[in-house]
Amino acid sequence: NVDRVPDMDDAEKKRLAAEAKVIVASRYFDLFRHFGGLPLIKETYDVQPSYELPRATVEETVKYMVDLLDEAAATPQLPWDLGTDDTNWQGRFTKASAMGLKCKILLFAASPLFNDNVPYCMEPPQDAVVNHQVWYGAYKPELWDQCWQACVDFFTELQSKGYYELTQATEATAQGYRNAYNK
């Protein structure tokens, strides 16, 4: 819907659309950690009496999150970091955060919680296990390779872009950390 905003230049629209993709991926990841595969919402919906969306597999959910982050990171208008002069944009997602979140998602997905020869939970009902909504269905070593490659890509980009860090507290007090958190 950002395309319909009047008096906003195309660069800002593309930046905000990329940020929105990172936000969606981060919210999906929060849910994924608790529930595994999720219904994938890829379009806007009108008011309807029912939304019958099937639950996706773990693999489909991870792919959806990673694809969103790849699309966001490939957007030239999404900056690597915000810098100190960009105070109007503080607290926003950046290319670095998109690439870092991708690493975190792939690491979590490759972990034994989802990637093992035996499902994490063996208690009935087993519908989610059988449908691969809470695990991959078998151990897949290539998931570790995907995670490793995402980390290599992140650190390669980090070297080319220079230094990157999270906001640091200016003083080691509760108020100093609170101020850094609120930036």
What are these model-derived regions, one by one?
Residues V47-Y51, C121-M122:
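A sequence-level detector of short, solvent-exposed, charge-rich linear segments
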Residues D7-A11, L40, P141:
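Short coil/turn and helix-start
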Residues N1-F35, P49-Q90:
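Conserved, well-structured interaction surfaces
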